[in-house]
C-alpha cells in the first residue's frame, strides 16, 4: 500500500479489505477502531503531491458519515442515502439535505451515489411502483428481483425516464457524482 503513485491503482477497491485491530475484534460495521487505521492511511496519503484521498464505502447512519469523510481520514464517503431513496420527492429532498449537512460537518465535498453493486439499478427501481416502506429500502424492487420479475408490473420506459431525470438531478448537485 506504500506505492500509491502507480497508474494501475486508479481503480483500487479496498471495500473487500476489512482491517482487523490488534485486539482481535472484527470491525465489520462502523467500529470506532477503524478510524485509527484510516488516520494512519491519511499520513501515507499526505506524503504524495498532491495528497491522495480515498472514498469510504461505509453504509453507516448519516450522522456518522462525517467521520469517514474527514480530511484527517479518507477524505470522502459515498453518500448512499441517495441510492436508498425511491422516486418520491420528499425522500430525494431528505437525501440531498442529509448529504449537504454531512459534507459541511466533515469539511469534505458532498458525494452522490445513485446506484452501485449493492442495490437494484436505478432504472429498474424507478420502473416499479414507488412505495415507501419504512425501514426497508427498495422493498418492492428486491422482491421483484427475487421472484424473477413476476411480482410487479415493470414500466421500463418510465423507469428509464426517471433514471435519466435522477442522474441530471445528481449532476446538478454540489460535490462529486458517482452514477
Enumerate the predicted regions with their spans.
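Active-site and adjacent substrate-binding regions of carbohydrate-active enzymes
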Residues: 1-179
